[in-house]
Amino acid sequence: MRCPSCNSLDTQVKDSRPTEDSSVIRRRRVCVTCNFRFTTFERVQLRELTVIKRNGRRVPFDRDKLMRSVQISLRKRSVDPERVEKMVSAIVRELESGGESEVSSEAIGEIVMEHLRDLDDVAYVRFASVYRNFREAKDFEAVLGELSAEDETPRLAPVRK
């Protein structure tokens, strides 16, 4: 692994451990050349995904870009970062297990919105406003109406014994 400080390829792993859900390996590394310490994360990648943008351009899927867009929608919201990480991992697993090597940006946006709806209503509305390119207040009203309708949908009470 190349050192982010001095670009040396001579680094050593000092500590390696799985995350709580064992989906990621966290490694603490140190550069032998400059003694810079840094952390890397290793994840399973089921397949190489290509994103088909709205303009037809194809770009490699970027998990970090997905994480950044979710974090922007969650800015100043009190959501546990671990829940965000689990949500993004679930989205990536869903995309990778879909059987297709190419996925549209629209499909990714819809999946993200499904997950955000369960995580945080405000983040859902923020993400929807960018993803759906809101232009007027009525666009926000429509999404808020969707959330209200979902909240009013009767849910079955749990069966108690």
Swiss-Prot record:
Residues 1-11 have a biased composition (Polar residues). One of its GO terms (molecular function) is ATP binding. The keyword Zinc-finger applies. Its cofactor is Zn(2+). Pfam families: ATP-cone (PF03477), Zn_ribbon_NrdR (PF22811). GO terms for biological process: negative regulation of DNA-templated transcription. A zinc finger (unnamed) spans 3-34. InterPro entries: ATP-cone_dom, NrdR-like_N, RNR_NrdR-like. Residues 1-20 are annotated as: Disordered. The keyword Transcription applies. Keywords: ATP-binding, DNA-binding, Metal-binding, Nucleotide-binding, Repressor, Transcription, Transcription regulation, Zinc, Zinc-finger. Residues 49-139 form the ATP-cone domain. Binds 1 zinc ion. HAMAP family: NrdR (MF_00440). Belongs to the NrdR family. Negatively regulates transcription of bacterial ribonucleotide reductase nrd genes and operons by binding to NrdR-boxes. This is Transcriptional repressor NrdR. It comes from Bradyrhizobium sp. (strain ORS 278). The gene is nrdR.
